[in-house]
């Protein structure tokens, strides 16, 4: 779609990481993860924990780093929006991304946030267009940061196959 053509899409590699780091402001030091999938949230959180000790989450096994208030991020924060904390009486974020989209905009306003990591899960039980439903919010989040002289990096992981609807290619 034309929305996707306007995005600066790249696969992750070391030169790209160095380039991104150079574009960040000194105060931009935190990663925020906004996940639909609990396993993807967990794996990403533990990967970040290998380099950083201050990683908070609503699914953090260490009580010291479990968020007391899921509506307020602390330092590096990884949220599983599919956890009961967020889905009690509400649809799962793979079906309805509204909660996660609101949080994306909120996190974009934090001048200490450098990167927002998100997953998009395709296939049965998922939103008919999970990426498309979030594109405008991603552009808005980047614009919020740009208006404050910051570049906000969105790192997205798409989980699916060409047999899923929508397909991985779409």
Give the ranges of each region predicted by the language model.
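C-terminal non-catalytic interaction/assembly regions of soluble proteins
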Residues: 4, 22, 85-86, 90-170
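Short glycine-cluster motifs
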Residues: 27-28, 33-105, 110
